[in-house]
């Protein structure tokens, strides 16, 4: 089968990579084309030749109405590119991973064009904008949920779904972070042997620019308290990001604020507390 998968952020890249592994295992002849990131691309290259990555999410993950308005032209161009690419490739199914701001529009278009549409990791309609349930009913052929409490919710709403647990649990269980000691983690990242408070701002550009100033203010105030003066604050950055995304926020705080990339599980494991932006983390 031909699978067209769309993931628009770091969490979707993680979910997408695990999904792709499962697809290749169940369907060795699977042909996959996708929007995603490094993790999905790594799985693709293990099983297929050529280029499967259409759009890297790092080139434009955005949040909120203001960000969409400011980047309306590029957003519109991405829709055009996406629709044209799906039409040209003609997949057996379009699989959408979370990212509702973009994927709901794709779901509507793909459904109206006669493509099967699967939504993997249901959008959090139970938390906000519940009216989107109408779109799920109208445009999605199969909905995959990951939280047990979603079972009675979607049952009550009359939406058919598939529940097989949460793939993040498998990812955490298989993480090398669980096999590494605190001493090894600190040594590998050249970190001092002091208590850790984790800071998780999110992976999107908009999240980083919105949350890092808040997190740095928090770190400053905590560091100024005698009982927390020796703590280190570790920013758990997405693997897709670089130090340039954080340097202006960390500047002048290097003595007590550190940044590590692609090690969220390890940072959380070895932290005594965490401040976490809403999201997959």
Identify the residue ranges that each predicted region occupies.
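Charged active-site motifs of nucleotide-sugar-dependent glycosyltransferases
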Residues: 2, 191-198, 231-232
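Active-site and donor-binding regions of nucleotide-sugar-utilizing enzymes
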Residues: 3-189, 200-212, 221, 225
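Generic structural signal for residues in well-ordered beta-strands
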Residues: 32, 161, 233, 257-259
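A donor-sugar binding/catalytic signature common to diverse glycosyltransferases
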Residues: 38-40, 260-281
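Glycosyltransferase donor-sugar binding loop
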Residues: 233-243
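Nucleotide-activated donor-binding/catalytic signature segment of Leloir-type glycosyltransferases, i.e.
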Residues: 246-263
